[in-house]
Amino acid sequence: MAALTTPRISRSIPAEQHGRVVAEILALAATDPHITARSARSLRRALRDDRLVVAFDDESVAGWFLSEPCGPGVHELGFIFVHPSVRGDAVFIDMLNLALAIDGRAVSVTFRADFAGWLIRSKGFRRVTLGEAARVSRGWFLLRRLAPGRLGTALRRTSSGEAWYLVYDRPR
């Protein structure tokens, strides 16, 4: 994957490209144990609903940021991946800004205190309890982690450090 100086970032991907984008994401996920697998079906749904922010290096997928709906006006900022060839603050920030624009309110979790602090200081997130994250997401935040395919991943991650549950409210 040859790095361009500025990857193209979009969440409005033409329908005829959905199959290729999903295949590339699944191929990248299969090679990296840190990527939480998502089904082809859920990725296609996210693409169809403009809830998958994708970074392209030339025409290849170089990163993605998944937004999972939690009801009207609320979404969970799911997994983000940026390929090392294009990794940098600008790509990540552009992807994050595009993801935050999807709904007025977002919930997220990280186990990296430094990253959580950056989100709080620079983007206006606030730290909340697990109960508050569940309430804001109308229970979806917990339900997703209890799904059979994701429970093992959730348990491994929660045992790896302190969880920082975060909520973002878009400024009015």
Regions found by a protein language model. Name each.
Residues 33-83:
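A conserved beta-strand-loop-helix scaffold within acyl/acetyltransferase catalytic domains
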Residues 25-52, 145-152, 156-159:
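N-terminal charged segments
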Residues 126-156:
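Conserved catalytic-core motifs of GNAT/GCN5-like acyltransferases
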Residues 101-114, 128:
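Conserved GNAT acetyl-CoA-binding A-motif
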Residues 82, 87-101:
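Conserved acetyl-CoA-binding loop-helix of GNAT-fold acetyltransferases
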Residues 20, 72, 114-115:
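Short alpha-helical
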Residues 1-38, 54-56, 162-172:
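Short amphipathic alpha-helix that is part of the acyltransferase structural core
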Residues 119-121, 125:
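Conserved active-site tyrosine of GNAT-family acetyltransferases
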